[in-house]
Amino acid sequence: MSMEDPFFVVKGEVQKAVNTAQGLFQRWTELLQDPSTATREEIDWTTNELRNNLRSIEWDLEDLDETISIVEANPRKFNLDATELSIRKAFITSTRQVVRDMKDQMSTSSVQALAERKNRQALLGDSGSQNWSTGTTDKYGRLDRELQRANSHFIEEQQAQQQLIVEQQDEQLELVSGSIGVLKNMSQRIGGELEEQAVMLEDFSHELESTQSRLDNVMKKLAKVSHMTSDRRQWCAIAILFAVLLVVLILFLVL
């Protein structure tokens, strides 16, 4: 087989994880069967570790499925036959069944009830030397106090979280408000500049109209002069009109 075959690397990790999970499962079963041998903290820790290990094994089995798919896509590269692939698939199937059996036993109603009873006993600090009436009252009194402390702690955490969210929202609102103020000032300045430019354009338009009117009058007068006779008055009139035109142009440039 090829040295690059990734199946055996993942398979070794899965086998180690299964051995660890089986040890945890055995300890977890012992704790539930004999409540006097452990505290509630040990049961909770063992239960969480067992669940995490089973979940990790399931993920590793998915990786093994992917390696088989890779090998099946290119069998020549890994030099594997159908028999070897069947063996690998059988390993994945059997391991997955082992994990499923442990998860099923952990999720049965009887086991859950036993675990709850053990947690309740550890919380209450059960003692066989007390009589029924006194022991029962003390148990439930301690249970109520523990529940009240747990509820108070939960409420405090929720209030602190809500306060943090409110503070973050206030900071965001302040940032948004500042941005809106900046945009408002910018829009006001832009609006004022546009109004000033509009007034300037309007004045310039009036000046152009006035100048155009003056030029039209001059052109009309020049047209009339062109029809005059070529005597001395004609030349005088032309000179005068030319002077007027020159003055108008100078005024236009000055204005």
UniProtKB/Swiss-Prot annotation:
- Which sequence ranges are marked TM in the entry? 235-255
- Please give the CDD domains that the UniProt record associates with this protein: SNARE_NTD_STX6, SNARE_Syntaxin6
According to Swiss-Prot or TrEMBL, what is its membrane topology? Single-pass type IV membrane protein
Query: Known Pfam families for this protein?
Result: SNARE, STX6_10_61_N
Key words, A-Z: Acetylation, Coiled coil, Endosome, Golgi apparatus, Membrane, Phosphoprotein, Protein transport, Transmembrane, Transmembrane helix, Transport
Which parts of the sequence carry Phosphoserine? 2, 129, 152
Task: Tell me where it resides.
Answer: Golgi apparatus membrane; Golgi apparatus, trans-Golgi network membrane; Recycling endosome membrane
Q: What is this protein's function?
A: SNARE promoting movement of transport vesicles to target membranes. Targets endosomes to the trans-Golgi network, and may therefore function in retrograde trafficking. Together with SNARE STX12, promotes movement of vesicles from endosomes to the cell membrane, and may therefore function in the endocytic recycling pathway.
Q: What is this protein called?
A: Syntaxin-6
According to its UniProt entry, this protein's organism is: Homo sapiens
